[in-house]
Curated annotation (Swiss-Prot):
Orotate binds at residues 34-35, 128, 156. This is Orotate phosphoribosyltransferase. The lineage of its organism: Bacteria, Pseudomonadati, Pseudomonadota, Gammaproteobacteria, Enterobacterales. InterPro entries: OPRT (IPR023031), Or_phspho_trans_dom (IPR004467), PRibTrfase_dom (IPR000836), PRTase-like (IPR029057). Catalyzes the transfer of a ribosyl phosphate group from 5-phosphoribose 1-diphosphate to orotate, leading to the formation of orotidine monophosphate (OMP). It comes from the Bacteria. 5-phospho-alpha-D-ribose 1-diphosphate binds at residues 26, 72-73, 99-100, 103, 105, 124-132.
Length: 213
């Protein structure tokens, strides 16, 4: 685990974005942890979040031309990541996002920002079922662009309805790499460093044993 990944876990815990306990997910599964990126909800939170996304992007080594944030959660993520890439990595990248509703006046269309072209890095909070990615792929392909990769905050590394995870399905279906700031493996490594969190460690390991990929 790299220093920025440990810092991201501590940041998420401090904002209660990441919580340990017992939670029922939309899928009906009982999970020993919960991650709600919507609680990164202040200017400072967003500034820090962008820096973590930028670190993961640079760390990945994936080459791309443009950042794309799917509406709605991906919009502030793409924006703050673009700012962080310019401020901390001297890379001034174009970014764009889609509207859920196409405008019928003014500039029109359902895209805002730079022209959607070239190799696109899609940024979002998490991938649960992969639906947002599939919708985004239709937009990317309709504009003649290609998907270079996908960056999310957390990879839960757990099976979907079948034997593989929603992330593995996206990688398979679109022949792209999905990268994340942290993974379930990183969470476990972090808990192993914290003796006072031993009960959570046991629960997360048991969960991985049952649902992990």
């Amino acid at each position: 685990m790299k220093p920025y990944q440990r810092q991201f876990i501590e940041f998420a815990l401090s904002k209660q974005v990441l919580k340990f306990g017992e939670f029922t997910l939309k899928s009906g599964r009982k999970s020993p942890y919960f991650f709600n990126a919507g609680l990164f909800n202040t200017g400072r939170d967003l500034a820090l979040l962008g820096r973590f996304y930028a670190e993961a992007l640079v760390d990945s080594g994936i080459e791309f031309d443009l950042l794309f944030g799917p509406a709605y959660k991906g919009i502030p993520i793409a924006t703050t990541t673009a700012v962080a890439m310019a401020e901390h990595h001297d890379l001034d990248l174009p970014y764009c996002f889609n509207r859920k509703e196409a405008k019928d006046h003014g500039e029109g269309g359902n895209l805002v920002g730079s022209a959607l072209q070239g190799r696109v890095m899609l940024v979002d909070d998490v991938i649960t079922a992969g639906t947002a990615i599939r919708e985004s792929m239709e937009i990317i392909q309709a504009n003649g662009a290609t998907l270079a990769g996908v960056l999310i905050s957390l990879d839960r590394q757990e099976r979907g309805r079948g034997e593989i995870s929603a992330i593995q399905e996206v990688e398979r279906d679109y022949n792209c790499k999905v990268i994340s700031i942290i993974t379930l493996k990183d969470l476990i490594a972090y808990l192993e460093e914290k003796p006072e969190m031993a009960e959570h460690l046991a629960a997360v390991k048991a969960y991985r044993e049952e649902f992990g990929v």
